[in-house]
Amino acid sequence: MNLKNREIQACTIIDGIQDELKSISLFLHNNPELGQQEVRAVQTISRYMEQHGLDTTVGLTTCPELRTAMRSDIGLDRLHKMAFLGEYDALPELGHGCGHNLIAIMSMGAAIAFSQIARDTWGTTFFGCPAEETIGGKVFMANEGLFKGYDGALIIHPGGENEVGGTSLATHPLEVTFHGRSCHIASLTDSGINALDCAVDLYQSIKMMKQDIFPKEAIVGAIFTQAGTAPNVVTDKATLRMTVRGATVSDLEDIILPAIKAEANRIATSYGATVDMHHYEPLFKDMRQDERLVSLFDEVMTEFGESPRKLPPDEADGSTDVGNVSYEVPTAQPTLNIGNQLEAHTPEFACAAGSTYGLDQAIKGAKIMAVVALRYAESLEV
């Protein structure tokens, strides 16, 4: 069977299961679960993948962060293997305001179709990746080596327009806590050390460093999570929690974060305070989109009537744990329009993720991904 016929057959397979996939997506949409709590989602998806001949494992490795991670495999003894990345965690209050219920069925449909068409020469894995919105399940999956040995990893994200290419920002959230010494604000002994002054000075210093020291792509967002309990008492403990982003892991880990930590230590010393620092979420690496896969998504999305905007390799929008996958295996994550100019993480986007149009677009996305996988597979076999 030639490539064109295999592509047609893959799309026919997805058409044949589209009602079931849409039903699963609506179930996820109507029963949103936060990261690391996606029990019903995993049960539903794993049962369905097993019905289509893929061996499924829930809870990957002994890593506690991967209790709701899963994988569905077939043909892992083949020379080549393709990974399809699914997500299913929701957002607090908004539910599926990032459309992970659609991501799940796009990758499920593509994996099922690819596994049936390419099973003689290719292994297939659907990875269920938990907690993208919080701890980043793929970070831990990559650290555990789960993506090693794959020839490609594919995922499509719903959005407000069609896009291919680009990158994502590296991020490594940081919490800084200053410890001072409490006393009454009117104490004549002047024995207090104001931890809040330290935190405020660090906040102001970061604003200046963004202008003078950091690379231009650096982004730091910060809030005070502890700032004292009474206005007439010198604050003995103050905490600044921040998301810190850079264009690359190198910029972030070698320039931006060391500068912030050094400044925190300098400020603490100048006041006679002490300081504790820790990363409260893991490192999300920048995305290294594979140009071959980007070109194929550009080509196939256009053929399906979804001509994408091609982003420059250095254009970034937010951060994602898919970046960590891209350091391990050739990866691409295009964006498929489910509502013109809609912004993710909004009530409107959550509605679109459960709409008839959103579901129809997800079925189209599954077909696009399956066709890209087949063309990419053939290019590696030549």
Each model region followed by its residue ranges:
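Hydrophobic face of alpha-helices
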Residues: 14, 18-21, 42-46, 107, ...
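Histidine/acidic-residue-rich, glycine-tolerant segments that coordinate divalent metal ions
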Residues: 68-74, 89-97, 101-105, 119-235, ...
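Metal-dependent amide/peptide-bond hydrolase catalytic core
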Residues: 200-382
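Buried hydrophobic packing segments
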Residues: 45, 106-114, 137, 199-206, ...
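A short small-residue
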Residues: 2-4, 23-27, 88-92, 178-186, ...
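Short coil-to-beta-strand
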Residues: 78-84, 170-177, 236, 332-334
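Acidic/His- and Gly-rich active-site-bordering loop/insert found
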Residues: 2-122
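Hydrophobic/aromatic beta-strand patches that form the interior of the parallel beta-sheet core
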Residues: 82, 127, 152-154, 330-334
